[in-house]
């Protein structure tokens, strides 16, 4: 199983990586498209009216350590910084719990290109 989430969604739901003591290991990979906040909300068209308020209330920039969070829940971690690296990582089989961290920047076109690969 592979799931594509944004960084804010990952931060909200990271506890889902926790595996109970009586549970068998599962093969699941969470691909984190990290735009350092909720850039998807730029699609709402409200940014121009109040850029500072929009950033604080909608994009909510953050500096979370995604690698440390993955490790804390016992999941493997890998960071990819190019579309080629992402493409190669996605071609590999999923074994166990893992987090594939793909910083995509705040620009929608970067996110769209990464999303097309997944």
Ranges and model annotations:
Residues 1-118:
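Thiamine diphosphate
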